[in-house]
Structure formats: C-alpha cells, structure tokens
Regions:
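Structural preference for beta-strand elements that scaffold enzyme active sites
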Residues: 60-62, 87-91, 111-117, 182-186, ...
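C-terminal domain-boundary segment and adjacent tail
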Residues: 213-216, 287-329
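Active-site beta->alpha N-cap acidic-glycine motif
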Residues: 46-125
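Acidic (Asp/Glu)-rich catalytic clusters
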Residues: 53, 78-84, 101-113, 130-143, ...
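Active-site beta-loop-alpha junctions enriched in small/polar residues
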Residues: 68, 95, 117-123, 188-190, ...
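Catalytic domains of cell-wall/extracellular-matrix polysaccharide-remodeling enzymes
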Residues: 158-234, 239, 244-251, 260, ...
C-alpha cells in the first residue's frame, strides 16, 4: 500500500512537472488527468454542419489569423491576407498599439470576419501593455511593473474571475466603440483555457455578448456532469498551428500535411502573420517562437499556390465564425 501511494505521488509530481515545463498551467488533478488522457464528456452543437449548409462528413475549415493589432507589420500582412481571402477570419488584440488602424479597416470592410483575441498576458521583453480597464480595477491581472503578467502561469495563479470578466468586457466594449463588430472571441496564448473558474468567466462573457467562444477539443475536458457544456458553445474538433519544435525548413510540409489529412467536422488552422522587418524583429527580439521570421513563413505558406490547391484537391469547405454566430445567436 505504501509503495502504491509513493508510485502514485511520483506520477502526480511528474505530470505537474511536465505541465510546468511546457507552460500548461493546470493545477487541478481531475482536469490534468482528463487533459492527458483526452477524456471529455460533451456533445457537439447539434446539427452544426447541416445548419452551415454541409453534411457531417464534410471537412469544414476556418483559416484564422491571430494577433491583429499587435503591430503595423502584423496589420499590413493580416489585412492583405483577409482581403485576398488567404485567411477567412482573424482576431484582434485590443490591448495593443495598432488597434485604431484595425477599427478603420473593419469599418471599410464590414463583411470581413473579425473577432477578439482576448488578451491577459504581455509576453514580449521590450513591448509591454496593461489591460484596457484601469489597472486599479483589475489588480489581480496586473504585475508589480504595471503590466499584464508575462506568461500564462503567473496569470492563472493570480487572476480572479471578477477582475477577468471586467477586463474581457472592457476589451469587447472598446472594440465596438471603434466600429468593430466582433464575430467571436478567442484567447491570446490560450491563457483562459486552464483554470476552470477563469474558463467559465470566458464562456460567460461570450454568452452575455452573443459571441461564439473558441473552445478547441482539448479544452473541452473541463465539461462534465458538474460543469456541462453550455448549449451555445461550438467545439472546434481539430485545431492546427505551427509549434515551437517545428523546423523552419518544414513549414510548407507541415501545413500541406494538415490539409491533406484534414478530417470531417469543424477544423481551424491558426496562423500568425507579419513581415520579417525591423519592427517585428525589434518586438520579438530573443523570442524566435512566433517571431518575425515565423510570421513571414506563415504568410508565405498561405499565399502559395500549393496551399490553395490542397484546399481544393481535398474538397475542404471554408466557413467563418460569422456564419457560426448567425446560427447560434
């Protein structure tokens, strides 16, 4: 019995060490177990494919650009990709310096699918931001230097749901005041996905504002009998994104393989667009992951004929968050 307990304790410690190394701030043992095993208890939004005009066997895909508003470089690349249809959706960081340009773009292009990349972390070394709310009204979200916390772990450890809801609502309100009519919300760095109380706050803000909430399948482990999936939450069956262990030389191969192996259901490819220019190099200094070269590679791939051909050859149906919003609300 003693050795069984010691073995169990060792396993638990190993799991949480793994989470810590990989910046997965899950501190609930039940959620941690479900996250590792992939066990989840939920039903997808009923008849989603049919209501979008397709069948359950169809491969539905959103090609989504994150981090709009971060910089001029990101905006220029993302706006061009959206106008050309290289991506068909994107989301905006309302805490950043270039959101006025996004407001102007949204007003001139009201048909384009733009959501909000709800931001509660400030990860760059030399480019910091605080919340949209007055910092004194969201003290649990702000570090000692007056910025949002630099990583998900510190945010998850310190944030309380009331402060979080206040800030998320402020970001939505600011977007609307700039003429942006958001179609959905998602989470910068996935920071809202790990603690159940904070995740609930995220879902509540979406429902209160009639905005679809991005919930990828691995995050659906939160749902169970004690916390059933809200009826208006649509689960993204498969999410794809280049990760830090991907070699730059394998960029094209990775994305084409995703398209060639895409399965039925709702899928989302997330890209981070920008130019490998001085502005992005300065912002992402000492941070090659999601850095300037990374963003230019993402742009190059989605602009390629090979990428477009793979979409066509695999009979992939492009859908948007606006279409999903129109169905559920």
């Amino acid at each position: 019995m003693k050795w069984t307990f010691i073995a169990f304790l060792g396993l638990v410690i190993s799991i949480f060490v793994y989470f810590d190394i990989n910046e997965i701030p899950i501190y609930n043992l039940k959620v941690a177990y479900k996250f590792i095993t992939g066990v989840s208890d939920y039903e997808q939004y009923e008849g989603l494919a049919e209501k979008l005009g397709y069948s359950e066997s169809d491969k539905l895909l959103i090609i989504h650009a994150d981090d709009i508003g971060l910089s001029k470089s990101v905006n220029d690349a993302s706006f061009e990709a959206l106008k050309k249809g290289l991506v068909n959706s994107g989301s905006i960081m309302m805490t950043c310096d270039y959101i006025l340009d996004v407001g102007e773009f949204a007003i001139k292009n009201p048909e384009i699918d733009l959501g909000l990349h709800l931001t509660v972390t400030s990860e760059w070394r030399d480019y910091k931001w605080d919340g949209v709310s007055n910092s004194s009204s969201i003290p649990s979200l702000i570090d000692k230097k007056g910025h949002l916390f630099e990583n998900k772990k510190k945010f998850t450890w310190n944030a309380n749901p009331d402060d979080l809801k206040r800030e998320l609502q402020a970001q939505i309100n600011l977007a609307k005041s700039l003429g942006i009519n958001p179609t959905h919300i998602d989470s910068h760095e996935g920071a809202l996905f790990f603690d159940q109380k904070l995740f609930k706050a995220y879902l509540e803000v979406g429902e209160e504002n009639k905005l679809p909430v991005f919930v990828p399948k691995p995050v659906a482990v939160h749902f169970d009998k004690s916390f059933p999936k809200p009826k208006n939450v649509v689960i993204v069956d498969n999410m794809y994104m280049a990760l830090p262990d991907l070699e730059f030389s394998k960029w094209d191969e990775y994305y084409i393989n995703v398209l060639n192996n895409l399965g039925p259901g709702l899928n989302e490819i997330i890209v981070h667009l920008g130019y490998d220019d001085k502005e992005m190099q300065n912002i992402t200094v000492d941070h090659p992951n999601y850095g300037s070269e990374w963003r230019n590679l993402d742009l190059d791939v989605i602009s390629s004929q090979e990428f477009r051909k793979a979409i066509e050859d695999n009979n992939i149906k492009l859908v948007t968050w606006r279409e999903i919003q129109n169905i559920i609300y």
